[in-house]
């Protein structure tokens, strides 16, 4: 539906619009669509962005996923205060908290001030409908929705407990204390809810990066492989942190056409046959077609290692499937480029493909189980399965082998070369190998 001034005009004109940000165009962000079984409708959740965190997430409905969509109502607001600048009376905050409630904490970026954008709506394993949302500063939160309306479930209440929950925003899942973090997304697989977050800024040198945490409950707590909480209790620059499993870093190796940087703001999908796909956008150190900030959408398959953590295929998805019965010794053995996705650095120099870029080491997986080359150690595999374990310089990584096409076409090639790869995680750090 191209009539977005009519669809979103009510919230935009009444709450989000300011003299410094007067146009709705360019202020509609990050839609998320889900089929609501109770309503029998496709529900789109859209961020309507205003200045100074003065934003609202609204819901639209349609009978077809392609639309046309109709306005359903607001779900959650941010940026409100008790004064005249962003009047709370224009929101539902007093309906939730009660008339005269103290709103002081919602104006503190180290406390609960966040931007109500970037919704992800999902069902838990018990059939309850939830929305995870938020951006930077105050953190990422989770609200229960009413399946009958697709909007906030006003019958569900929350306590205000520092670093755990807020009476208006719901359960606190991640972030806080002014750290970066946006684009939350949750999927469920084999007993765990996986929370994806993007740290940093989305420009090429902004340190954009995807981090993963998991929990046995959709409401948390979410932790990384090392047991670190996704919630921050003190202020720090989390672009250089080892908190959260960084699914991939900025990297350059022979299997890619360009140097990948600033990957982020992903969604993810678990197919009916149990395969997992991650959709995200990437920028490039060299730019693309003369555009420094050019970006493209990518899809990469994810796998669950033996410890129950997600690891990403080294190359973009082109229809290949992992061998559930594994691979033979000749396919697995040989020389590999090996990249460690160090979580504490990122690309920071336009046009220079060496600053903050992960470069490969060269290793050889030998038939006797040893690893030789620039790094040394050992490796094993699970008979009848793609699962593998590799120990290098004292760090043990677990993951899978996968035979797939690389992303680089060499001179006179019409098809990408199919190569053996592996993707692993160990000591809270991901790594890839490509033969």
Predicted stretch roles:
Residues 1-435:
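Carbohydrate-active catalytic/glycan-binding domains of CAZyme proteins
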């Amino acid at each position: 539906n191209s009539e977005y001034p009519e669809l979103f005009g009510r919230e935009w004109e009444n709450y989000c619009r300011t003299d410094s940000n007067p146009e709705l165009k360019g202020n509609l962000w990050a839609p998320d669509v889900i089929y609501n079984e109770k309503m029998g409708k496709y529900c789109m959740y859209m961020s309507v962005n205003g200045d100074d965190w003065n934003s609202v997430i609204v819901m639209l409905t349609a009978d077809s996923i392609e639309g046309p969509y109709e306005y359903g109502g607001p779900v959650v607001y941010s940026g409100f205060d008790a004064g005249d600048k962003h009047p709370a009376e224009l929101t539902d905050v007093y309906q939730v908290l009660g008339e005269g409630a103290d709103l002081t904490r919602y104006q503190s970026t180290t406390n609960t001030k966040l931007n109500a954008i970037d919704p992800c709506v999902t069902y838990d394993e018990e059939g309850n409908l939830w929305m995870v949302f938020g951006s930077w500063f105050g953190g990422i939160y989770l609200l229960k929705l009413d399946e009958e309306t697709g909007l906030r479930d006003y019958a569900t209440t929350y306590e205000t407990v520092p670093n755990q929950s807020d009476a208006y925003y719901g359960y606190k899942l991640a972030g806080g204390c002014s750290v970066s973090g946006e684009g939350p997304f949750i999927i469920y697989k084999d007993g765990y809810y996986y929370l994806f977050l993007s740290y940093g800024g989305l420009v090429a040198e902004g340190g954009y990066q995807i981090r993963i945490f998991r929990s046995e409950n959709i409401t948390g707590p979410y932790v990384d492989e090392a047991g670190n909480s996704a919630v921050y209790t003190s202020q720090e620059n989390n672009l250089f942190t080892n908190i959260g499993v960084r699914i991939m870093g900025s990297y350059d190796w022979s299997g890619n056409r360009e140097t990948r940087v600033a990957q982020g703001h992903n969604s993810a999908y678990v197919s009916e046959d149990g395969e997992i796909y991650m959709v995200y956008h990437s920028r490039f150190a060299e730019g693309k077609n003369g555009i420094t900030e050019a970006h493209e959408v990518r899809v990469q398959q994810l796998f669950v290692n033996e410890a129950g953590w997600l690891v990403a295929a080294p190359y973009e998805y082109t229809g290949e499937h992992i061998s559930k019965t594994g691979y033979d010794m000749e396919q697995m053995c040989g020389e590999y480029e090996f990249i460690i996705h160090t979580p504490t650095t990122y690309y920071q120099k336009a046009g220079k493909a060496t600053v903050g870029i992960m470069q490969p080491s060269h290793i050889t997986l030998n038939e006797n189980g040893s690893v030789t080359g620039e790094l040394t150690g050992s490796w094993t595999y699970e008979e009848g399965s793609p699962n593998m374990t590799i120990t290098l310089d004292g760090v043990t990584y677990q993951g899978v082998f996968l035979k797939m096409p690389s992303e680089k076409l060499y001179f006179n090639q019409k098809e990408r070369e199919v190569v053996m790869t592996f993707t692993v995680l160990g000591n809270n750090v991901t790594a890839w190998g490509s033969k």
